[in-house]
Regions:
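Generic protein-terminus/edge-of-domain signal
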Residues: 1-35
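A cytosolic small-molecule/anion-sensing beta-strand core signal
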Residues: 32-33, 48-49, 67
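Short beta-strand segments in beta-sandwich/barrel cores
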Residues: 33-39, 52-53, 61
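Short acidic-glycine-tyrosine-enriched beta hairpin
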Residues: 41-57
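Ligand-binding loop in jelly-roll beta-barrel domains
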Residues: 59-90
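An amphipathic alpha-helical interaction segment
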Residues: 93-166
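Basic/polar phosphate-binding segments, predominantly the helix-turn-helix DNA-binding elements
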Residues: 152-181, 191-225
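Pre-recognition alpha-helix immediately N-terminal to the DNA-recognition helix
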Residues: 184-188
Length: 225
């Protein structure tokens, strides 16, 4: 990191599958549109629009951004003297935090001046980050707990049939369950590809036709598998 605090506005028109890794600094994300999946250990948390999630230094995690997702990220260097939260979890995005992030997004990140107005905003965000109260007691604060088991099934590649679960999950993701299921298939395909599998091998391991993978690749990944 060039500065002690840095801001990035991420735009993902297509599925983005991050690798599992330990964070080299503390950071938080706030989803503006779409949804980000955060894997911590065996659990995967859904960060929907308007929701924030904090990840501390040295935290093993993986991020997946669904197609059409925009989110803000603020990174805090280990050089920062301000104490920050040492636990991962959801946090409440206050109107002030939302306004500060929106203000930062009006200017390209590479044009931000540490000694200018952007630097002052980032320092205010650092103060707010020091006060965050986080929790991982829920898989998604936007989804009623009775639907969490269905959400877990989908994220693990299974299908759901209960209408109430389908309606609740679709309202949070703002896309159909079938679209979400297709994204999960392609996420696993990407992971297998990264481990050296060829398309035919991936299709066999996922028990799907190779033609289906080819059909899903362009609209979901923006490129062939």
């Amino acid at each position: 990191m060039k500065h002690a605090i840095e801001f990035t506005h991420h735009n993902h028109p297509f599925l983005h599958v991050g690798s599992r890794k330990k964070s080299t600094h503390s950071f938080f994300i706030v989803v503006e549109k779409g949804a980000v999946l955060v894997r911590l250990g065996k659990n995967e948390h859904l960060v929907s629009a308007g929701t924030g999630f904090w990840l501390p230094f040295d935290c093993l995690h993986a991020l997946t951004a669904l197609p059409g997702t925009n989110y803000y990220q603020v990174d805090f260097s280990i050089r920062l003297t301000t104490a920050v939260c040492s636990h991962a979890g959801f946090f409440k995005v206050t109107p002030l935090i939302a306004a500060l992030l929106d203000e930062l997004s009006q200017t390209a990140s590479e044009q931000h001046q540490w000694e200018g107005p952007e630097g002052r905003i980032l320092k205010v965000l650092a103060d707010k980050a020091a006060q965050l109260k986080v929790s991982t007691k829920t898989l998604s604060p936007a989804l009623a707990e009775r639907h969490h088991s269905a959400l877990t099934l989908i994220l693990n590649g299974s299908k759901i049939t209960e209408n109430s679960d389908i309606k609740a999950i679709e309202s949070v993701f703002n896309q159909s369950v079938k679209e979400l299921e297709s994204c999960m298939v392609m996420r696993e395909a990407i992971r297998l590809q990264r481990s050296g599998r060829k398309p035919a091998q991936i299709a066999t391991e996922l028990s799907v036709p190779e033609t289906l993978l080819n059909t899903l690749a362009l609209p979901i990944l923006g490129k062939p598998l």
